[in-house]
Amino acid sequence: GNYAVVGSRYNDTGGTDRGAAFIFHKSGGTWTEQAMVQPSDTANDDWFGRGVAISGDYVIVNAYAKTTNNTGQGAAYIFYRSGTSWAQQAKLNASDSEASDAYSYSVDIDGDYAIVGSLNEDPGGTSNAGSAYIYVRSETSWSQQAKIQASDKEANDTFGRGVTISGDYAAVGADNEDTSGSNAGSVYIF
């Protein structure tokens, strides 16, 4: 494609470690910066931009240290391109967020679907087992379609460390999952 996004989680524009994402456009073989984006509610120590993904006119950027209602619960932001301008379209939060979930540690977007990993989430009280959330876009609104977990979840599996989505499929990594050995890790396909 002709667009790329690069995250900079320790960027200090506006304050300490707020983070930023830089969107580049390729024209005639030359890449130039088209925009720098930050969330509308940017704050110190959000670490916005550790994870980024782009699909067509949409960019998703994580801020896994973001504090909204709970310390370090995390948030993800979707930006939309119109012409040469990029604007925030949505802020995604877990429907069941808690402190230190690291929601949005990993993010991906494909067309009208986005996936957000929450590696420290405690599904069913299983500490740091992790979860992932799938969102769907309808016009300019994004809504949670599903929350997914490992069928064999255990404490500290960190399901959601890495996520990807493509068409009707999603893959979620759990780097500390123990099926093949201590912390050997697994990838789950949905």
Regions found by a protein language model. Give the residues of each.
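Conserved beta-strand/short-helix segments
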Residues: 1-190
